[in-house]
């Protein structure tokens, strides 16, 4: 897709709802993952490709309290890094999220949605596209510090069919979030430092997604990240009854209609 058009045909690329047939293969995600171990004659690189395609990940479901409209009280999201919540500076949702019903008559949102429909829908095309957002009037509370609120955006890089169609942004430790925060002048708070750095370490020119030690995070400070810090954060969220450990898959049902 180049400038909203197919690179070969020149046709305008649009996103539309269609009636389609699917094979319900997502039900067999665990079986597919386990059976890879029995494929002794398959090349290892092919099995790795299959593992990535299935995309099994361990993470956490988190509920974020929403203020600004009585019709929306909570938004749920899935994350593999709940331990970076103290670096949370925005909540982003898909243009197909239920929240979009509140903005269906908003002219500016319609323009934004039309603009998003011109982008490709593959992970590769979304990763390469400019990160754009539409700011709502809503605010999300940080579940670990409810005095802290952040803006809620619709964003072109959030897919409705992954997790719950919503992600929390931690710009200091995710490059996509970093680019988005720079564009919209959002806070970039460092909450993980490399092991050999001091506590005053700050992310400046690019995100730091690597391992290290939790900082600037109140009761999580000093924990080894990501392994110990993730486990401890999930325990805290489960105790508060606002989050729980869960498993997610990239694998989706197989569409067979064209």
Where are these regions (language model features)?
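Short, surface-exposed linear segments at secondary-structure transitions and domain or protein termini
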Residues: 24, 84-89, 160-164
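Conserved phosphate/anionic-ligand binding catalytic regions in large, soluble enzymes, centered on
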Residues: 74-97
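Short glycine-rich loop/turn motifs
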Residues: 57-61, 89, 135-137
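Short amphipathic beta-strand/extended segments with alternating polar/hydrophobic composition
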Residues: 2, 71-80, 149-154
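A short, sequence-level motif marking secondary-structure junctions
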Residues: 19-20, 79-84, 154-159, 220-221
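Residue patterns forming the tRNA-binding/recognition surfaces of aminoacyl-tRNA synthetases
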Residues: 1-75, 166-258
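Catalytic alpha/beta core of large soluble enzyme barrels
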Residues: 97-195, 200-201, 206-208
């Amino acid at each position: 897709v180049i400038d909203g058009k197919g690179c070969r045909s020149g046709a305008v690329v649009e996103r539309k709802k269609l009636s389609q047939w699917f094979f319900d293969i997502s039900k067999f995600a665990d079986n597919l993952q386990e059976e890879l171990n029995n494929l002794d004659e398959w090349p290892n690189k092919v099995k790795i490709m299959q593992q990535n395609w299935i995309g099994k990940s361990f993470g956490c479901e988190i509920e974020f309290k929403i203020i600004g409209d009585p019709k929306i009280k909570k938004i749920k999201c899935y994350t593999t890094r709940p331990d970076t919540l103290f670096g949370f500076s925005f909540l982003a949702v898909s243009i197909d999220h239920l929240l979009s019903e509140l903005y269906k008559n908003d002219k500016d949102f319609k323009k934004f949605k039309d603009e998003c429909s011109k982008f490709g829908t593959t992970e590769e095309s979304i990763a390469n596209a400019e990160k754009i957002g539409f700011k709502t009037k809503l605010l999300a509370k940080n579940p670990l510090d409810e005095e802290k609120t952040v803006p809620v955006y619709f964003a072109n890089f959030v897919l409705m069919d992954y997790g719950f169609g919503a992600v929390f942004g931690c710009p200091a430790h995710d490059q996509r979030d970093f680019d988005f925060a720079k564009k919209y002048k959002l806070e970039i708070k460092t909450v993980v430092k490399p092991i050999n750095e001091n506590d005053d370490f700050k992310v400046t020119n690019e995100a730091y997604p690597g391992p290290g030690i939790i900082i600037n995070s109140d009761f999580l400070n000093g924990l080894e990240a990501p392994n110990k810090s993730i486990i401890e954060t999930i325990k805290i969220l489960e105790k508060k009854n606002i989050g729980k450990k869960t498993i997610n898959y990239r694998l989706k049902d197989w569409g067979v209609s064209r």
